[in-house]
């Protein structure tokens, strides 16, 4: 490159002025004029672009050096167009921004795999992918990012060193080592390629590929030490939720351990001596907030591990196909787990606090249960009912879920009942706290959860009664109390979906899952009325009539909402048998009442 130093110096001065406006002075822009410095930078770059365009025309006319200056001017012009495009997009002038970014690509495409071209080329593609994502053109965005990835890989294989704009402005003297700005910028750009690819894959419904790109992004940030600790921890913890959903507990635990370690390291030095009291408070508040979020992710890990373990134990022991599939998946995931690690972090101590293996016994589950509660306590310490009611409610629901899962592993029936009552108590306390008008979704979840909890207590109490020849009145009373509490919650749930109680018409626009839960609620109420214990025929008649009413509504609902009823074939069979049996029982009781001279 033989552009005279004085000309390069003039170009450099303009470029650095624009860069200073964007990177430094824009921080002081008033809220009433948020783009002031960016507009100034844009004007400076437009002047620089005009000068470069003019010089390029002049150079192309002479072509004295065989095109070497030509390429240098193309490179500088491409850098300027890239930065102009970025500014236009930031100032919400998307069409102009897109135009500038495409101009950048036109300029460098002929030498995109050369040191002078690769950085502006990949930089422009990254910016364009943001534009395409904003227009929901995810396939097109992914296509150009995949091209950028291939160009990066080919360039790395070539052994050449990329040139940043600083390197173009300051070419090394003969015999000197080249500058290092280029390699660092290229690696940073490729990290962004991985990040944007993760977003595209996510939007295109390919979560596995999205997760791989996310992990690669985080891994590269760690290696280059170019991460914000809070952002890194949050992104890593968020990625763990994908692995949890895939039952890849080893990878999930690894990512949560990484998030926890990075947060712990950050906490040690986050408060600096020169900070004002306000800055210290802000930093501490942000840390507590985000640590609480990581804590909630840990709790979700434990809850999902317990639930998956429970479902696995409930599975048919003779299901050989399921067992063989589990073995195949486990072997496949050993390789995947190795590829989804952060080798530079020592996470052993953090990982050893919790298992990534399925719970097989109560002792296994108890360890996970206590682990979940520890993290929920941390989350609850930040999210308070008075100012974060929704998040507080979710944490309380997580406590309730933990008791639901641990009750499954408990073998002592009395303890099972206690755990289900604790589960119900968390949900009932929430119902006392929340106004259904503003928190209807959460209240519905609590009504349904509390109903199933009390129904579970009822089943345990009934088993205890059946095991004795002469049940104590106190035991019968406990059964009936559990029944009435369960009915109360299920009826509240049902009423919340009715157009106008006492009309039984369901609200329109309920989705299939809501319809299914509504059907289940009717089934539960009918079943529980049938379980109520009474020695008085009038009460027995009342209970059986209520049971019959809800079973009829369940049956009618299943016929009306066939898609929702697809998974309820077992319940449908039971109900239809009961609808044949119940009228006989009801008539028998009525006959007894008539015989005794009592009116039904």
Curated annotation (Swiss-Prot):
Gene3D superfamilies named among the record's database cross-references: Tetratricopeptide repeat domain
Localization, UniProt: Cytoplasm, Cytoskeleton
Protein name, UniProt field: KIF-binding protein
A single Gene Ontology CC term: mitochondrion
Single GO biological process annotation from the record: microtubule cytoskeleton organization
Coiled coil: 384-434
Highest taxon above the source species: Eukaryota
Principal localisation: cytoplasm
Keywords: Coiled coil, Cytoplasm, Cytoskeleton
Family: Belongs to the KIF-binding protein family.
Pfam families (UniProt xref): KBP_C
InterPro entries linked to this entry: KBP (IPR022083), TPR-like_helical_dom_sf (IPR011990)
């Amino acid at each position: 490159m033989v552009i005279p130093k004085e000309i390069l110096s003039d170009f450099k001065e303009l470029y650095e002025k624009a860069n200073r406006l964007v990177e430094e002075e824009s921080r002081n822009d008033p809220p009433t004029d948020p783009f002031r410095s960016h507009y100034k930078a844009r004007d400076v770059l437009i002047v620089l672009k005009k000068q470069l365009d003019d010089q390029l025309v002049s150079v192309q006319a002479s072509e004295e050096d065989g095109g070497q200056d030509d390429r240098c001017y193309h490179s500088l012009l491409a850098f300027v167009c890239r930065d102009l495009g970025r500014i236009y997009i930031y100032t919400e002038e998307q069409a102009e921004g897109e135009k500038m970014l495409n101009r950048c690509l036109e300029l460098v495409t002929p030498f995109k795999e050369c040191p002078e071209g690769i950085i502006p080329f990949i930089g422009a593609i990254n910016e364009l992918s943001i534009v395409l994502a904003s227009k929901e053109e995810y396939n097109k965005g992914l296509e150009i990012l995949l091209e950028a990835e291939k160009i990066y890989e080919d360039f790395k294989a070539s052994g050449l060193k990329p040139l940043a704009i600083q390197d173009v402005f300051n070419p090394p003297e003969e015999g000197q080592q080249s500058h290092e700005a280029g390699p660092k910028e290229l690696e940073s750009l490729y990290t962004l390629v991985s990040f944007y690819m993760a977003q595209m894959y996510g939007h295109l419904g390919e979560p596995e590929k999205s997760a791989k790109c996310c992990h690669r992004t985080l891994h590269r940030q760690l290696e280059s030490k170019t991460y914000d600790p809070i952002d890194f921890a949050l992104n890593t913890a968020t990625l763990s939720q994908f692995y949890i959903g895939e039952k890849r507990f080893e990878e999930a635990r690894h990512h949560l351990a990484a998030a926890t370690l990075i947060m712990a390291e950050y906490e040690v030095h986050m408060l600096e001596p020169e900070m004002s009291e306000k800055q210290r408070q802000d930093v501490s508040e942000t840390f507590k907030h985000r640590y609480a979020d990581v804590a909630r992710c840990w709790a979700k890990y434990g809850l999902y591990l317990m639930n998956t373990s429970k479902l696995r134990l409930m599975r048919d022991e003779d299901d050989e196909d399921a067992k063989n599939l589990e073995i195949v998946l486990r072997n496949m995931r050993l390789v995947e787990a190795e590829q989804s690690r952060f080798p530079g972090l020592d996470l052993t101590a953090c990982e050893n606090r919790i298992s990534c293996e399925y719970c097989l016994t109560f002792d296994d589950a108890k360890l996970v249960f206590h682990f979940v509660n520890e993290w929920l306590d941390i989350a609850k310490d930040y999210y308070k009912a008075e100012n974060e009611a929704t998040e507080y409610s979710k944490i309380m629901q997580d406590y309730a879920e933990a008791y639901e899962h641990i009750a499954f592993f408990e073998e002592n029936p009395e303890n099972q009942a206690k755990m289900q009552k604790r589960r119900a108590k968390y949900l009932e306390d929430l119902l006392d706290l929340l106004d259904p008008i503003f928190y209807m979704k959460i209240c519905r979840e609590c009504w349904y959860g509390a109903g199933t909890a009390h129904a579970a207590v009822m089943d345990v109490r009934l088993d205890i009664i059946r095991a004795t020849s002469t049940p104590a009145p106190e035991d019968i009373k406990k059964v009936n109390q559990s029944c009435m509490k369960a009915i109360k919650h299920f009826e509240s749930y049902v009423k919340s979906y009715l157009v106008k109680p006492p009309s039984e018409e369901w609200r329109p626009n309920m989705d299939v899952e809501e319809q299914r839960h509504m059907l289940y609620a009717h089934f539960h109420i009918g079943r529980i009325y049938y379980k109520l214990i009474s020695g008085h025929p009038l009460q027995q008649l009342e209970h059986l009539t209520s049971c019959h009413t809800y079973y009829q509504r369940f049956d009618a609902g299943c016929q009306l909402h066939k898609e929702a009823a697809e998974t309820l074939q077992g319940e449908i069979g039971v109900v239809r048998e009961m609808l044949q049996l119940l009228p006989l029982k009801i008539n028998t009781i009525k006959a007894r009442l008539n015989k005794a001279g009592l009116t039904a």
